[in-house]
Structures are given as C-alpha cells and as structure tokens.
Amino acid sequence: MTSSEEVVEVTVVKAPEAGGGKLSRRKIRKKDAGVDGLVKWERFLPKIALRVLLVEADDSTRQIIAALLRKCSYRVAAVPDGLKAWEMLKGKPESVDLILTEVDLPSISGYALLTLIMEHDICKNIPVIMMSTQDSVNTVYKCMLKGAADYLVKPLRRNELRNLWQHVWRRQTSLAPDSFPWNESVGQQKAEGASANNSNGKRDDHVVSGNGGDAQSSCTRPEMEGESADVEVSARDAVQMECAKSQFNETRLLANELQSKQAEAIDFMGASFRRTGRRNREESVAQYESRIELDLSLRRPNASENQSSGDRPSLHPSSASAFTRYVHRPLQTQCSASPVVTDQRKNVAASQDDNIVLMNQYNTSEPPPNAPRRNDTSFYTGADSPGPPFSNQLNSWPGQSSYPTPTPINNIQFRDPNTAYTSAMAPASLSPSPSSVSPHEYSSMFHPFNSKPEGLQDRDCSMDVDERRYVSSATEHSAIGNHIDQLIEKKNEDGYSLSVGKIQQSLQREAALTKFRMKRKDRCYEKKVRYESRKKLAEQRPRIKGQFVRQVQSTQAP
C-alpha cells in the first residue's frame, strides 16, 4: 500500500430488526494528494447517467440491446409495446432522457408513437431515435420528416450506442446554450420546468443514488417553452427574409447595369457605323474623323473625347498581334472626304476660279483640337495641277449622303459618277481603307468632285498588296460608311454576292469536301487486307445466315 493512500474504517450501526441486530463494516479507501502533489482529474468531471427508454417487440433483441446500453453506462427502461411506452411517457416524461424505438411495433407502430411524442408539449423535446432492419431511403426519409433525431439500422453497433448521448447534448444545447447546469439530471430538470410556476425558476441540487450506493449525476439543462422558441425562430426568419430581399434587389440592379453596358458596347461596335443620309453634315464629319482612328483600334470618337474626361480605358491589341503595324502607325493627316456643307454647295458658282477658292477654304479650315494638323497642300496630288472643274452633277445625284462615291474596281476610278451606280461594282471588302492608303490618295480617290483618275492611277497602283491583305471587311464598312450600304443594296438588286468572305468560305468548304471524298475512295477494304491469314480463315469458317457457327470436328474411323 502506498503512502498516498489512507485506509479509514467506518462502522455503520443499523437499527435492530425482528431478525436481530446486524453490524456491517466497510473499508473506504480514501485517496488524497501524495507527497508529489498529483491530483486525479477524473473525479472533477461530471458523471452523466442518461435514462433510455427502449421500445422493442422481440424479447431476445430487447435483452441484447439493453445489456449493450448498460455496458455503455446508460440506465435502461425496456418495454415491449408502443402503447406501454406512450403510457409511461405520459405518466413520467421527466424520467426519460432518450427514446430508442423500433419502427415495427405491435398495437402502436413506431411512426404513430413518434407522431404522438412530437405532438406532446413536454415529450417533443426528448430525442427519438428510430431503429429497424429496413435501410430503404423512403423509410429513413419518413422518420426524419416526422421528427426523429437519428435512424439506426440493425444490427446495432456498440460505437453507435456509445454516441447516443450526443443527441441529448445537442438537443439541450440548441434550446438554451447560455445555461447548462452539470449537477442535475435531465428528467429532474424537465419536471422542474413543468412546475416552474411554483419554484420561480429556482433549482435545488438533487443527488440520484444508484443501486450500488454510489452517487451519480447527469448534465442537462431545463427545457424552454415552445412559444418562446417559436417567437425566436419567426424573428430570425423575418430577418433572413429581409436580407434575402435586399440581396435580390442588389443583384437585379447589377444585372441591369451589365445589360445596359453590353447594349452600349454593341451599339458602339456595330450599330453606330450605320448612319442615315439626312443627319447633320457636321456630325457626319466628326464621326468620319473618328472612324479613321477606329480602323483597327477601339478608340472613342472625337466628339465624345472632347466631352468626356478620358477615364475609360481603350482596348488595344497586344504587341504580338498582326494588327500592331496598323494600330501604332501614326496618322500623318486626318482629312475629311465629306462634301462641303449644303449651304455652301447651293452658292457654288459655275466658274473654275470660284470652285478653287471654295476648295481652298475647305482645306484651310481649322481641324479639331485632338486631330493632328494637316498639310497645307490641296486635296489633289499635284500642287501645280489645277483643280477639277465642277459640274452641274452636284445636285443631280439622287439620295446623296455624306460622301457618295463609286467604288473603284482594280484601282480604276470611274469618270462619270452617274454611270458608277449602273456599272458592275466590286465587293466592299476590295475597296481600300484609310489605314492602308495615304491620306492624299484616299481623299483624292473618294472625293466626289474628282474627275481625273489618270493622274492618280500610278499612285494607286503603288499601294502595298500585303497591307491590303490584312484589312477586314468590317473595317472597310466602318471606313466607307453609308455609301457601302447603297452599294450593297444595288448589288443585291443586280444579283451579286454580298461579301467575298462568304465566297472564300464556301470555296474552302468545297475543297475540303472534295479532298475528303477522294480519301474515302482510296479507303477500299477489298484492295488491301492487312492480315491475309485471318481473311482466309474467315472464308473457310462455316456460316449460317452470315453468322459464324462452331465447326464440328468430324471423327475419322481408324
């Protein structure tokens, strides 16, 4: 015997009975702290004694489960019938901490017992665990919907029974997590909760004695009233509903903003390039100047750049892009190919001198502040060459738009603008763009008053073919504007195709189909067979209606 243990002898004297007096002695071993000051911390932990109501119809199964529960430190009360279990619960609901019941029961099934428990005011706070040999999802789902805390499939395992106390702990903690007294049992707390009007919430310490005389206590907390729980749940649901509504409204606002931004981007990229012929001429000049910058880089128009602060970032291709040579190429001049204002055209004189004066006034007009300064040269190639004579065809063109000019075919300019609309036109994608032609060439080629294509033909033929190859059809549409729309309508009437890109796509597809058909003709399995032996064996094997049959070996006589 160690020095840290001390034996105390206690004599208990009982009152004399009919059979005579009896003296009993018990030796109590008292463990105190030793010299080294070690204290066993297990004696400070609370000891939980959960009382389980076991409802099982089969006698042997009931005895086995009760024995397992007792080994796991539970106090078990076993009943064979659901009706008896319900009567026991109605009589003393505070004496049960956990209910373990079978689904299939006589007199009252497990579903009915579960429904009765969930409808009772006091018993509904007791965790009910259903058990059965059936493991179907429908059965489990039905039990969970009725309010079961868990579902166990037979045969039960010991670790499952050891963890049953967690259901009681979770249930009591979820009801009132603030106060959790460790020195009172679950059933006594429920009884005091039912008689809380007399005690006014004051609890006394109770000691539950076991069969062996040792004192045990269980940790639980008092139940809360159902009404207060419902009020808390309803308040929490209302707050969650308000939060959900606010989040939904914010989501709708963000979605509307995104849709409006996408619509603006679509209008900026495509629809803004289609202009009607009756718009203001000054707006058309500003839009055309911005189109030169919008050739292959997404820059904003000059009018919008003057108004805005320039905070929005612009899109530019990377340095490895094929369009870099066009995007970063500086624009030497930024001229407008639009005709003069309608008021000026009405006052144009028939003489050549007045025409030259008018053209000089147009050329020396002040450019917009953001655009680079133009050269002081004329719209025409040679400085010494006289200006082209004006004709009476200015007001004779029907439906004249911003710059109604004929499209050149193979770099050949039409002499008469009236014959340009009746002749065969080249596709829109073949016409040069401002990014691939110098400003002087572009202004002289597409100016409506130009009647000298011979002087420009050499300069037009010097245009680099490689540069024109990179220009897309969408860029040409944006550069030429409304005149392309008129040409497309005319070409639709004459029966010509709308774009060369579609023709090239159809030609490539036709060539691919032809190549595929030629390869398919070469794949003739009759001409080349990889395994000759397999072919011979297949021909020798007997067939019945095309299917191979097992060959019967004929027995030869000795």
UniProtKB/Swiss-Prot annotation:
Residues 240-260 form a coiled coil. GO terms for cellular component: nucleus. Keywords: Biological rhythms, Coiled coil, Nucleus, Phosphoprotein, Transcription, Transcription regulation, Two-component regulatory system. The gene is APRR5. Residues 180-233, 297-319, 535-558 are annotated as: Disordered. The expression of APRR9, APRR7, and APRR5 requires the presence of LWD1 and/or LWD2, indicating the existence of a positive feedback loop within the circadian clock. Disulfide bonds: none annotated. Residues 303-319 have a biased composition (Polar residues). The lineage of its organism: Eukaryota, Viridiplantae, Streptophyta, Embryophyta, Tracheophyta. Residues 51-169 form the Response regulatory domain. This is Two-component response regulator-like APRR5. Interacts with ADO1 and ADO2. Interacts with SPY (via N-terminus). GO terms for biological process: cytokinin-activated signaling pathway; phosphorelay signal transduction system; rhythmic process.
